[in-house]
């Protein structure tokens, strides 16, 4: 386990904070611009370029999961995985950009472009799964906030790359995954948590419901990207407004410092997507970007929620993170693919946008209530109580602290939490800032493997049974 002295400092710490942002920018540039994609009018393919990318992305995550089962990291080492990721990512980005904008696009019926897309997608999947594996082990209680910072930074980088000339934008796109790898290397020095004291029972995790809800929500997102499209100017405004919404949400997370980050990321997803759909039909044409921007915000909250919860639950259940995290991303991309194909078909049929929006909102309501509500999220983190007559709280807290690698200060906070003390009381008692107290509580929850105070109390009650 890393110690405080090995943590990244200065520029390295900044890179570790926003390292994922370079990956997200890379994906946004590929999906939302023509930097790496050819003109749709000159493409030799019989399906849309976004659908082609999503198909390759699904296959990329499937291959990464398979490589994880074959112990790729054990065979070629940590450095080998990083080198392979970098080579595939750069080769894929440069290959896509060069082939897309030259006569090479028609060679072999587009075979060169397909090869470049395959390299891009596999490198993209390897990089994101590497980040997910790292997040699952971090001891800090604000992984969700770091995700929000990275995604917010990605909007700034996205507009920067879009403003570059084509050749420079292609070069920048190839450098983005390398920058993310550098940030990932620095983030490796951050403190890690030990295996959780009371791991989750995998049978208690509503896997099927979660995956179906994930598929449905991403399918709705895919439909929205094809049915509710505007002009280039409105798309720019939509991304700008979506970025501002995410910036405000990130600021809220840092000010409020919620100890339950999974729930904090879950709450805005359905309201943002549903309200975005509704606003598109209420607002005048010149203001449509507001609804589209809110949907972008909701879609990216969904992405971050998937990444945070799937990596954390895999670690707590002691399942291979590559398998759980990679499968969740595969299902998400498959949902986006189906939604994209359905959206294109509906657009070609000139289907009623009001009817499409109504159906999408209904699907979101079903996904967020019947399939995977906040109560299902609670089940993934709940520790079932087994009351004990033993009341030796100090000994129990000390045992939990030793097993989970809590610091001396966190042990003090744990002792107060065990007695039902609130964060403001703990701050006053220990003469520390309220935000510091909340960060200690959040870190304790993450290291111990719970997400609320009741589960922590239940775990302390169970301690004498060991």
Q: Where are the regions a protein language model picked out?
A:
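Cytosolic juxtamembrane N-terminal segment immediately preceding the first transmembrane helix
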Residues: 2-28
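Linker/hinge segments immediately adjacent to helix-turn-helix/homeobox DNA-binding domains
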Residues: 3-4, 26, 30-36, 40, ...
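Central cavity-lining transmembrane alpha-helices of secondary-active solute carriers
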Residues: 50-71, 246-252
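Transmembrane alpha-helix termini and helix-breaking/packing motifs in multi-pass membrane transporters
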Residues: 64-72, 154-181, 336-353
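C-terminal ends and interior cores of transmembrane alpha-helices
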Residues: 86-105, 271-284
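Hydrophobic core of transmembrane alpha-helices in multi-pass small-molecule transporters
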Residues: 108-129, 287-303
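Cytoplasmic helix-loop-helix junction between adjacent transmembrane helices
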Residues: 124-148
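Helix-turn-helix DNA-binding segment
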Residues: 387-439, 447, 457-466
